[in-house]
Amino acid sequence: MFVSIPSIRKTVMSLCAVPLMAACAFAPGMRFDPQRPLDPADNASVPKITQITPDLVRGGQAQVPRENVDVDQLLAKATPYRIGTGDILSIVVWDHPELVFPTQTYSIGSAYDIANFAGTPNVPGYVVSTGGDIQFPYAGVIKVAGRTQNEVRDEITRAIARVVKDPQVTVRVLAYRSQRIYVDGEVKTPGQQSIDDVPMTLVEALNRAGGINVTTGDNSRIRVTRGGKQWVLSMPALMHQGIDPASVLLRGGDIVRVEPREDSKVFVTGEVVRPSTVLPRNGKLTLSEALGEAGGVSPVSSDPRNVYVIRRAAEGEPQVYHLDAKSPVALALAEGFELRPKDVVYVDAGGLVRWSRVINLLVPTATPLIGAAAVAK
């Protein structure tokens, strides 16, 4: 059967024409369609798009809400250490060594910081019982839990004054075992820490843990847990507000966790020069900074009128923000729009670029047909 050359050419053109007319629909790669429902079975699940405008930025809606910015409950002045259950006390009555019994000698490991005690781990001491008391010669049972060293000293002095003339008493805490905090996360030496006579501030706790890991730790997301309540503290934000981080006083049972920086990363994808993940600096990252870290929008393939920020919402459906960045003035709006952890910044491709990509896919398919037509001719 004879097939004419014009017929072959018409067939080739017909095969190419259909996908070309639907180039945008069949173009490879991602594309954001604001009219496409999130759930194919629910036509009403079209995402709501919020325009990034000067009013949005001025109204503060473009700012990231700060978690538990009210840190007043954590701020306190340091007070003298108060003795607790399990602490070991040294009680010395000068010129009366008979008041120190050999049976009151305890072995204290190097985990406890006993300063200036002749370098020996075996020291005479009195362990505070679970009831919060100790027993001392000629003084009987003394309640010491919740009291300072000076308060205990004064009571013992009064109690033994009837048998010891002008007693000179010294009371020290040898081992601090009653109150502990726990430091976890991105610090060099996470673990348990005992609260002692040095006020356990946030700065002190982090220093004892070796400091925040500079490569993986996020100093803008330090989580403090106390009694079921949590605060997320930012060192830069505290200092910006004029609050000394050393004024954050920790209590026994507190948990301090330094969150990893990786948890705060933002994804920049689409038609940018370098699709990548971007980490915030000092807990803050704007849309303009994220685009800048990715090399900016691609001058060849991007449609700067369609810059989107996709944010996961608590209720499940994503929040979508749109910026028309065709004009460089729009970058000022982008600088005022703060990104949140795990936001996705997407720059759409231009219509001509999508059409060109379809052509590039069709050319390898159409070339053999065109070659066959030439041979038949």
Curated annotation (Swiss-Prot):
Keywords: Cell outer membrane, Ion transport, Lipoprotein, Membrane, Palmitate, Polysaccharide transport, Porin, Signal, Sugar transport, Transmembrane, Transmembrane beta strand, Transport, Virulence. One of its GO terms (cellular component) is cell outer membrane. A lipid is attached at C24 (N-palmitoyl cysteine). One of its GO terms (biological process) is monoatomic ion transport. It is found in: Cell outer membrane. GO terms for molecular function: polysaccharide transmembrane transporter activity; porin activity. It holds the Pfam family SLBB_2. Disulfide bonds: none annotated. It comes from the Bacteria. A lipid is attached at C24 (S-diacylglycerol cysteine). It is a multi-pass membrane protein. Its main location: membrane. Residues 1-23 form the signal peptide. PANTHER family: POLYSACCHARIDE EXPORT PROTEIN GFCE-RELATED. Belongs to the BexD/CtrA/VexA family. Probably involved in polymerization and/or export of exopolysaccharide EPS I which functions as a virulence factor. This is EPS I polysaccharide export outer membrane protein EpsA. It comes from Ralstonia solanacearum (Pseudomonas solanacearum). The lineage of its organism: Bacteria, Pseudomonadati, Pseudomonadota, Betaproteobacteria, Burkholderiales. The gene is epsA.
